[in-house]
Amino acid sequence: MNVRERVDLARRHLAKSLELKGEHIGVIEMRRHFSCYFKGLPNFKETRLKLVTLYDIPQIYGLLDEIEERWGDYAPEAVSVYQQQ
């Protein structure tokens, strides 16, 4: 899945979170998920820190647009949530 697809999924996830939880809780709960959506992107630390500290919803959507523009076609290696033992 490339970054463009991940951004689209993150936008839909954010919209649902806002709808179900309200603006304040919805934004706060999405912060933990954003890191997972964009894990493995090169030089992403500064953008990630910004993404997980923003409260303003239009700014969050704007930053998602920037992520899509900058890394859009990049496809990081799939990361399993299950560790093999």
Q: In which residue ranges do the predicted regions lie?
A:
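Alpha/beta catalytic cores of nucleotide-metabolism and tRNA/nucleoside-modifying enzymes
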Residues: 1-85
